[in-house]
């Protein structure tokens, strides 16, 4: 079986699966990866000749990590005279180990300059070290307990008291990448669909944008890393424009489709995995603008949308499919004013704030090897606080306007998944900084194009880069 049936907790001496009962030159390999929960296991032969399943790094991955690679090297590379490896770098000539770096030669002299028998018992097998139990308080009883409290079972690997490094399955990163991509795929702000600087009162706006985003980060306590590329097409149109006593109210509908692809690697693991999300979206939006023609003064923008997703995780272990669905709602406010200037161009400053509530219900999934992938919660809140500065021409507000926006992004979304009830975190930083550079201008009297590039950074090696192209047609 390729599923250990548990959460995949840390092992010290490994799980014995083949007992040789003597010497054998046979070399065993796994027919397919063995995974328990989030962790991946491999076969290692110990110095007793038996084979064990362990989740640990190998020398080729990290030279500083300990290994038992079938040649029976054990941490210190030093011989315990019984044929057993001893981490202390000390030779035990009679089968009895004295951890102080001194040989106990059977005559029970402690070569560190201390004579055994100063009230200390050396009973042949043996307790030693000046009244202290041999080997850090551990009995070496011939077969033998050794090295800091770890059992050296007559030729078995002694792990030096340190748990073997665990190796995560790369599928973990693919599941985490899919989960975050589905949550964020259709989240947007007003500028994504409506950056117009001039509109007649009765103008309706039909719009379409395409955006791409690439992001990468480490997850699972730095045991897995992944990158995700997302592409989204969103189309919408106003169906109402209503002047009010103060300002103007516009409303419309929208729909969209998107795809996200994730590539995941696990530390100390030669395998990789891929994730894929195909998403679809329908929603409504409404905007109140204080100035009826120009984007000046205050505004309030709201939208709500329902989305559904088809998710896949593929690797050389399994191909998995599962579904998710959810909805999101946003409230955004801002206020723009012009810096007075006698120059032809001047700056328009627009502070913005936005809060998005997101709910995503991902079905609990059990893969072909029995690993259960479940969510911990369904809802999350995203926040944004920023300032947009546009450099515009005072006598012709429809002329091309370059702009820069700086945002503080708050909230990482639902960041965790459970694999056989063991939680693994996406490690997406809760706080991130974002910089956007863009330009907006008219192609003709009724059509406007906007181009934007963005970068986003945070802890845990998190980085994201994006591009956005928007077409608006007023009619």
Which sequence ranges carry the predicted segments?
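Outer-membrane beta-barrel strand-turn architecture
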Residues: 200, 241-245, 290-294, 337-343, ...
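Detector for outer-membrane/organellar transmembrane beta-barrel domains
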Residues: 322-338, 342-416
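Outer membrane beta-barrel translocator domains of Type V secretion systems
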Residues: 156-341, 453-454, 459
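Outer membrane beta-barrel transmembrane domains
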Residues: 243, 280-283, 372-475
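Transmembrane beta-strands of outer-membrane beta-barrel proteins
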Residues: 206-208, 249-253, 282, 296-304, ...
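Outer-membrane translocation/initiation segment of Type V secreted surface proteins
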Residues: 3-246
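Flexible, surface-exposed loop regions and adjacent strand-edge segments
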Residues: 224-228, 268-274, 316-323, 366-373, ...
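Short glycine/proline-enriched turns and hinge-like loops at secondary-structure junctions
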Residues: 9-10, 225, 344-345, 398, ...
